[in-house]
From Swiss-Prot:
It comes from Methanococcoides burtonii (strain DSM 6242 / NBRC 107633 / OCM 468 / ACE-M). GO terms for molecular function: structural constituent of ribosome. This is Large ribosomal subunit protein eL39. One of its GO terms (biological process) is translation. The gene is rpl39e. Keywords: Ribonucleoprotein, Ribosomal protein. Gene3D superfamilies: Ribosomal protein L39e (1.10.1620.10). Pfam families: Ribosomal_L39.
């Protein structure tokens, strides 16, 4: 992937943004009911279907 198109970069950026952990304030606000992120993606285990 040497040359990414603009659309591809935008989709990669979105995937990167979605892959962040649950914010601390959410954990505190929900009294630790929401701690994990079920859609979290590991770069080596799961592949991205970016076109």
């Amino acid at each position: 992937m040497s040359h990414n198109t603009k659309g591809q970069k935008i989709r990669l950026a979105k995937a990167h943004n979605q892959n962040q952990r649950v914010p601390t304030w959410v954990i505190i606000k929900t009294n630790r009911k929401v701690v994990s992120h079920p859609k979290r993606r590991h770069w080596r285990r799961n592949s991205l279907d970016v076109k």
